[in-house]
Amino acid sequence: MAAATSIPEALDHVGYLGRFQIIFMILYVGSAVIHGSITFQFQALSIMPKVICLSQRCKTLQENESKDTLICHLDVDEWKFDNSHFNWLTEFQLYCDNTYLKGMGTTVYFVGFMAGVSLLSSLCDKFGRRKSNISLLLGFLFATIGLHHSTSLKMVYFFRFFLGFFHSGLSVCLFTAFCEFTQPNVGAFANVLCGTAFTVGGSVSSLLAYHNRYWQDSLPPLILFQAAILLIYFVLCPETPFWLLARNRNSDAIESINFVARINRNSPLPKDYQLLHCQEEKEAGNPFRIIISNVTLRDAIMRLSFAWFTVSTCFYALQFNAGAVGDDEYSVMIWMGFLDVPARLSILYFAFRYGRKCSARWYFTVCAVSLGLCLIPSVTEMYLGTMTFKSIFVMVGHGCGGGIFSLLYTYTSEVLPTLARSTGVSMCSTVARIASILSPFVIILNQISGSLIYFISLACILTSMSLMKSIPETLNQPLPNTVAECEVLFHGKSKVESV
């Protein structure tokens, strides 16, 4: 009988970056472009056309009780509206007294995102990655079709909520599934590429919204096509070997790895191959209890959750505050997205070379310096070409936030056990969505003080840097499969032998 070995060693044998993983990565990264377009679709369409001119309120005529006809001439301003700039605000008349509804499209989406990431991601740990992804993709398709055929504002908000609801669970489950079919560094690479694709999708949304009034009609078919391809892929693919082994389904885990071997055109595992059994977790049926009942994991999730909240504040608040930096709102949104690309790709290099923890600290520092400079009027009012320095500093801070966002997905998953990995990431993401929900209303902070959003972001960054000091480095470390292995990662205790 062959000696028992671990899943990473088995994936080494069948190929951890072969055809199977490359196809998965292409679908995973490609979906992020669509998701980025969906997330920022309403923002790109929520810029009020500047050609709308409203008249002053008409003067009320005095009541005329006589039967004589009175001819009156009132001089009022002309009401003029130009339909050449079409967006969802003009379609549902969300201007004048209805302006407060402008941010609701994005807020409802993020409320759904928070609800979904709280309720759905734990299903991924409980019922498996494959079944969860199939169910979430079906729900995602339903919400997309419903949104495309909405005929009222209530229907738009309803389906926008469920689009965020299913998108949130899908994003976490897709990421978890991919990481468990390959090595951690490959998972980190794919996640950063996914984040880059997400921002490119958001920038393309802004660009298309600026040039084409009917661009949003072409988005649903792309979403349906991408979701259908992913759905077929997961129907054909097996469950991840990590999840199967955590459930002590050794033979199924070996069969899953052999499926990867066939797609990668490598030799399968020997018939007498054995995987190391995991210690059965006491709370295996409840992923939340695995985290809450362990002091180490609970403390780590609390610290990482605040880091997620901080990054979400910097990323989305600055994105939705694009019109307050003094330049054209469309231009700032587009540049923000495209400048995120080098920021996210560069953090990939630093994360592989110097580690996750060190890279996060460096990017937090650059973000803090950029936002701190936004508080100096004499500097921010200077121009570089046609853009103010304030716009440049905001874009740098936004880019660093996007880079850390990609890194935190990977970093968080690498410190959690298999049966609580998806749940732990979702708990952190839930906290981040609180900032996302509030982000569209940063205009209220601008009415109090234009610098308040930068003060808040700066304070959050400094606090996060302090809290993350106790999180261990995970570079070149295998994914922990049990709570005991997490304890080793955090405290260096003697490793519990598998039985």
Residue spans for each PLM region:
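Non-transmembrane, juxtamembrane loop and terminal tail segments
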Residues: 1-12, 237, 244-292, 424, ...
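C-terminal ends and interior cores of transmembrane alpha-helices
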Residues: 138-151, 366-383, 437
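Helix-breaking motifs and short loop linkers at transmembrane-helix boundaries and internal kinks
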Residues: 128, 149-154, 166, 183, ...
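Hydrophobic transmembrane alpha-helices of multi-pass solute transporters/permeases
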Residues: 1-74, 90-121, 126-133, 137, ...
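Glycine-rich segments within core transmembrane alpha-helices of 12-TM secondary carriers
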Residues: 31-39, 112-113, 167-173, 182-234, ...
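C-terminal transmembrane helical hairpin of 12-TM major facilitator-type secondary transporters
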Residues: 358-408
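Short hydrophobic/alpha-helical segments at membrane-entry points of transmembrane helices
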Residues: 152-160, 217-218, 386-394
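Intracellular juxtamembrane helix-capping segments at the cytosolic ends
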Residues: 92, 169-182, 318, 401-420, ...
